[in-house]
A protein has these predicted regions:
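Short secondary-structure boundary/capping segments
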Residues: 11-20, 83-88, 124-128, 142-148, ...
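Interdomain hinge/linker at the junction between the two RecA-like core domains of SF2 helicases
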Residues: 4-60
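Conserved strand-helix element at the start of the C-terminal RecA-like helicase core
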Residues: 5, 61-83
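Long, largely alpha-helical accessory region at the distal end of helicase-like NTP-driven motors
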Residues: 66, 75-76, 172-215
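Conserved RecA-like helicase motor-core motifs
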Residues: 20-26, 82-97
């Protein structure tokens, strides 16, 4: 729930709490259940790098480690897995998750759109790729997107969805995972629209530390 509640204004909009209620929300003093994440943003580092080049580097890493790739659609999944043999579906997702958690080398696996509730700790996922902007699922968010695409409310929701995806590969404070962010729409939200400013404190700290390594 940490990513879901990073923006506590949801308590006002969804639960109808007032200002006094907001002052009494129980908040942890730290987020020491979050492991180490190296966050890589290839297009931010080098705007000339192509998606094919990024893909080739990631697939090389997948020869040794388990790499999970989150995409917004099955059409985008084909970029990574043209034959569809490494893409999770409703029919095989439980089997794939079990294989990843077994500790064995599985390699590259693609999850499409819905991945809430999927936890991939340790060797189950050593690199997690978010390729593209996660879709907004609620009717309210889709309405806001249609009438006010530059809305701050919408931007916060989009960043929240990105953070939820980032959390799939790291589940405890002694876990570690490399996060790769890619895709034009995702780049627009995080970079051009300053979505990075809406990361939770812990994620922003890890992002800033990672950025020092690429700069």
């Amino acid at each position: 729930m940490s990513a879901t509640l990073a923006d506590d204004s949801v308590f006002v909009s969804a639960l109808g709490l007032n200002t006094e209620d907001m002052k009494n929300i129980i908040t942890p003093e730290n987020a020491n259940d979050i492991g180490d994440r190296l966050i890589i943003f290839p297009k931010y580092v080098n705007s000339d790098i192509s998606e094919i080049e990024i893909k080739e580097k990631i697939e090389k890493i997948a020869e040794k480690y388990n790499v999970v790739i989150l995409v917004p659609s099955f059409s985008r999944a084909k970029f990574w897995d043209e034959r569809g043999i490494r893409t999770a579906t409703k029919d095989n997702i439980d089997k794939i998750v079990a294989a990843l958690k077994s500790g064995k080398h599985v390699g590259k696996i693609i999850f499409v759109n819905r991945y809430d509730g999927i936890d991939l700790p340790g060797d189950a996922c050593r690199m997690l790729v978010i390729d593209g902007l996660p879709p907004l699922n609620s009717i309210k968010d889709r309405y806001i997107q249609s009438v006010a695409p530059q809305s701050t409310v919408l931007l916060r929701e989009q960043v929240q969805r990105i953070e939820q995806g980032m959390g799939r590969g790291i589940r405890s404070n002694d876990d570690e995972c490399c996060i790769v962010l890619m895709g034009d729409e995702l780049t627009d939200v995080l970079s051009r629209n300053r979505g990075i400013d809406y990361f939770s404190v812990a994620t922003r700290c890890q992002y800033d530390l990672s950025k020092q390594l690429w700069d």
